[in-house]
Amino acid sequence: MSDYLFTSESVGEGHPDKVADQISDAILDAILAQDKHSRVAAETLCNTGLVVLAGEITTNANVDYIQVARDTIKRIGYDNTEYGIDYKGCAVLVAYDKQSPDIAQGVNAAYDDNLGQGAGDQGLMFGYACDETPSLMPLPIYLSHRMVERQAMLRKDGRLPWARPDAKSQVTIRYVDGKPHSIDTVVLSTQHSPDISLEDLREATIEQIIKPVLPKELIKGDIKYLVNPTGRFVVGGPQGDCGLTGRKIIVDTYGGAAPHGGGAFSGKDPSKVDRSAAYATRYVAKNIVAAGLASRCLVQVSYAIGVAEPTSIMVETYGTGKVSNETLTALVRKHFDLRPKGIVNMLDLLRPIYQKTAAYGHFGRDEPEFTWEATDRANLLKSDAGL
C-alpha cells in the first residue's frame, strides 16, 4: 500500500501576477473582438500605482489599451488608493511593437503544409486528465481554485466586507494507492482591511470560504487549517509584490500533478502553440479518460517554428490504460488534428474568450467558451479502441 501527501496551490484574481495575466488577456480579447487574425503577445507588469504594457502586436484593431487595463483592474476590485493600486489613478505605460517579420513568415505559411499556418515557435506542451474529480482534474488544484474563487465571490457580494482582492490557497491531500483518501492541510491567506481581528478573520475564512468547498467524504480526522499564518496581510496585490504575466503557469494548469512545457498562456493569440496546443492536449487527455480508456492520461506534443505537423506526439497512461499507449497515440493521430490551424479550427479559438481563463485555472471549469473541456470525442475513441 502506498501512502503519500501531494500539494497544489492557487492564487486569487487580485494576486499581482494574476492581475497581469488578466490585463494581458483582456487586451487580447479586445483585439480579437475586432480582428480575429491579429498576432498578439501582450505582456504586463504591475507595481504600486503603475502598469506597463509591452510586447508585440500586429493588428488592424483600434483598441484603447489604457482603458482596457483600467477596466480590468476595476473589475478585480482595486478601486481604492489604500489598496496600493487603483484603476482611476494608476499610471499606464504602453510600449507595444509589431510581430517580427522573421517569425511572421513561418507562421503565415508553413513550409510543410497547405493548411497554411506553421507553429509560432518551437516547444513542448502537455495535457493531462485523471478521474479524481468530475471535471477530470487532480483534486488538490481543483480545491485550491475553488477556495480563492469563493473568496472573491464573498468579497464582491458583501458577505466578507473586510476581504481585499489578493489571496492564495494551498491544499495537501493524502493519497492511498494512488487515490485521494483524505484532506491533510489547507492553507489560505487573504488580504484584509486593518480593522478586523485575526481571530474573527480566521473563523470567517474557515467557516465561510474553506469548509463549503471541501468534499465531506474526504474529511477524516483533524484537518490542519493555516489561515493567514503570518498574522497580518493588509499590504497586498501589486503593492506587496510586482506582478508579471506568465508567472503562475503551474496554477494555470495542473498544480504540479503533471509536467509542464514551460510556456505561459495569457496574452498570446492562438497561433502561439504554447497556449493552443496546451488546450488541445488537455482536450485529448480528457476525452481519453472520459472514454474509460485510462484513469490517468498525459499527452505531450512538440513543434518546430514554421512547421505545421507536430514533431512528436506521446500518450502516457501510467499503467491505467485499457489499451496500449502506442494504440492511444495512433488514435490521437487519427482523430485529432494537432497542426496549429487544425487546433484553432477544432476548438474554435479565434474568439475573445481568454480573459475568463486568466484566473482560477484554464482547465477543469464548466464554462461554455472552454471548448477544450468538451468530451465529445470520447465515444468515438472508445468504439475505435474496440471497447
From Swiss-Prot:
Protein's GO biological process: one-carbon metabolic process; S-adenosylmethionine biosynthetic process
EC number(s) recorded for this UniProt protein: 2.5.1.6
Role played: Catalyzes the formation of S-adenosylmethionine (AdoMet) from methionine and ATP. The overall synthetic reaction is composed of two sequential steps, AdoMet formation and the subsequent tripolyphosphate hydrolysis which occurs prior to release of AdoMet from the enzyme.
GO cellular component: cytoplasm
Record: residues binding L-methionine: 56, 99, 241, 272
Lineage: Bacteria, Pseudomonadati, Pseudomonadota, Betaproteobacteria, Rhodocyclales
Gene3D superfamilies linked: 3.30.300.10
Cofactor: Mg(2+); K(+)
Sequence positions that bind K(+): 43
Taxonomic superkingdom: Bacteria
Protein name per the record: S-adenosylmethionine synthase
Organism whose genome encodes this protein: Dechloromonas aromatica (strain RCB)
Single GO MF annotation: methionine adenosyltransferase activity
Stretches for region Flexible loop: 99-109
SUPFAM superfamilies documented for this protein: S-adenosylmethionine synthetase (SSF55973)
Binding locations of Mg(2+): 17
Cofactor: how and how many bound: Binds 2 divalent ions per subunit.
Catalytic reactions on record: L-methionine + ATP + H2O = S-adenosyl-L-methionine + phosphate + diphosphate
